[in-house]
Amino acid sequence: MTPRSYCVVGGGISGLTSAYRLRQAVGDDATITLFEPADRLGGVLRTEHIGGQPMDLGAEAFVLRRPEMPALLAELGLSDRQLASTGARPLIYSQQRLHPLPPQTVVGIPSSAGSMAGLVDDATLARIDAEAARPFTWQVGSDPAVADLVADRFGDQVVARSVDPLLSGVYAGSAATIGLRAAAPSVAAALDRGATSVTDAVRQALPPGSGGPVFGALDGGYQVLLDGLVRRSRVHWVRARVVQLERGWVLRDETGGRWQADAVILAVPAPRLARLVDGIAPRTHAAARQIVSASSAVVALAVPGGTAFPHCSGVLVAGDESPHAKAITLSSRKWGQRGDVALLRLSFGRFGDEPALTASDDQLLAWAADDLVTVFGVAVDPVDVRVRRWIEAMPQYGPGHADVVAELRAGLPPTLAVAGSYLDGIGVPACVGAAGRAVTSVIEALDAQVAR
């Protein structure tokens, strides 16, 4: 039988994982071609050397309780490169001062008034305390915006000072743009099971306290993972953009190249997906157009190692506060300091407020310096700096997002699959999982064709 040919469009973590999983599934004889027009692979995973130390300037951590990343690292022989966070906790900047991250919450949604003490006023604390006694109606399967549910049950202060900072850090969005089932699926599930109030649902959803670290990273940065995936997938990398996809799986690139494939995986952002499948998969095209994304910018700094930052992993900024940054990560506190410099990064940009698109590098650096004075009272003299922009890289998981994704996938023809951060979660583990699902889909479709 003639060896099969596979094409993967997109060279980020989703595309590289898809290529690796394909190679695992189909063996050495098949041809796997990966299209990525950028001068590097990895997408929003980008490791650079700042102050002589490797630092991730895109995604920088993964949740350890999810199995995908530890399993993938083990397959690639990289388990010994996995790092765990030091245990330093983030703070919230609200009301012009720093507060501990509220305990016993799920994405900032409280399980009791005590978890919000010091962060919200007494009237809001009383409202949280009385929430369980107030009438509450929940429709099984519903997916409200987080802000709508939380503001109704607890008031605007809980949204602005507790929930928004966490969701802004994860999605570059807000409680108004993210649906409950994406942000807090365990809370939605508890409500579906019959929880009688939101505080009751949060208590049911709280994960058991393991005492262990929550986040992981890689010694040497995500580049270590990218190199491993490229090496093991043995792809043919075409540095060109695919501009047209035709049935029978003919791909045309921007140079005029024409490529034939038995199966295709589109590991591109939703807007590009919509353009590529227009005329091929109308349901998928329509669903993909419903998914919007935010842009962000990261300012990375290396400062002298003795700079007097507080002992925390960083700061999440409430949306109604004066700092321009949405989050500050004290990377050397979070992962442990190496060498004689301390590394930190400031993230800018929320959905609807996107300085990544408008501010100059000099403006972002000036904002970073001002924000460090405002939040920490520390004026820094960086020894190295870097600015990176991530344009439309943060999909917004709005209300009903899971239904949109289900429709998007249902409209795909056999032997065409999708992978990406807009599908099953924005984090790296979710991207790894979605890539595996895409590969399984096209392999099963090809096997079914042979069986017929």
Swiss-Prot record:
Pathway: Porphyrin-containing compound metabolism; protoheme biosynthesis. InterPro entries: Amino_oxidase, FAD/NAD-bd_sf, Protoporphyrinogen_oxidase, Zeta_carotene_desat/Oxidored. Keywords: Cytoplasm, FAD, Flavoprotein, Heme biosynthesis, Oxidoreductase. FAD binds at residues 10-15, 36-37, 58-61, 242, 390, 426-428. The keyword Transcription does not apply. One of its GO terms (biological process) is heme biosynthetic process. It catalyses: coproporphyrinogen III + 3 O2 = coproporphyrin III + 3 H2O2. Its EC number is 1.3.3.15. Its cofactor is FAD. It is found in: Cytoplasm. One of its GO terms (molecular function) is oxidoreductase activity. Its main location: cytoplasm. Binds 1 FAD per subunit. GO terms for cellular component: cytoplasm. Belongs to the protoporphyrinogen/coproporphyrinogen oxidase family. Coproporphyrinogen III oxidase subfamily. Involved in coproporphyrin-dependent heme b biosynthesis. Catalyzes the oxidation of coproporphyrinogen III to coproporphyrin III. This is Coproporphyrinogen III oxidase. It comes from Mycobacterium tuberculosis (strain ATCC 25618 / H37Rv). The gene is cgoX.
